[in-house]
Amino acid sequence: MVLQQSDLLILGVVIGTHGLRGDLKIRGSDQDFPLLSKMHQLVFLREGETVLKCARRKAGWYKGHLLLQIAGYRDVRAVQHLVGCEVAVRRDDVPGLPAGEYYWFQLKGMTAVDRRLGALGCLEDIFTTAAHDIYVINGDYGEVLVPAVKAFIADVDLESNRILFDLPDGLVQET
């Protein structure tokens, strides 16, 4: 089966090797990055082209990076060609979450709608603060930063790719 780019979820990039036993040092791309340590089937990409499909042998954390060993590779020279590659997994292989919880990749790109104001725009990014995540929405109201708290989120509909908010007055600057 040929994998399409849309079938894959890129979770990190190989930034180097670690030690002599073929460990790869991976830097994460966003909050979904820790998922990579649990996935068994991996795809390494360079400029959108598949370099290697393989199984994870071992994974562990070291100084904020994921150290990854892949099956069949036990020497640093054998994995050196993977430095600079993106590390992806098949979207279909990602384990589900409990009801009401979502991976960031599921939310990014959703159409954001407020009950009172209507369409806000596209949920383009998410970042973390000490208190909670913040959704970055761009659209007719410019950039709107919405705290990701249950009080503001009325509904998340993955099938229709829409997130419905019930935002308080003053959070969105109306023109």
UniProtKB/Swiss-Prot annotation:
Residues 99-171 form the PRC barrel domain. One of its GO terms (molecular function) is ribosome binding. This is Ribosome maturation factor RimM. Keywords: Chaperone, Cytoplasm, Ribosome biogenesis, rRNA processing. Belongs to the RimM family. One of its GO terms (biological process) is ribosomal small subunit biogenesis. Binds ribosomal protein uS19. Its main location: cytoplasm. Disulfide bonds: none annotated. Pfam families: PRC_RimM, RimM. An accessory protein needed during the final step in the assembly of 30S ribosomal subunit, possibly for assembly of the head region. Essential for efficient processing of 16S rRNA. May be needed both before and after RbfA during the maturation of 16S rRNA. It has affinity for free ribosomal 30S subunits but not for 70S ribosomes. GO terms for cellular component: cytoplasm; ribosome. It comes from Syntrophotalea carbinolica (strain DSM 2380 / NBRC 103641 / GraBd1). The PRC barrel domain binds ribosomal protein uS19.
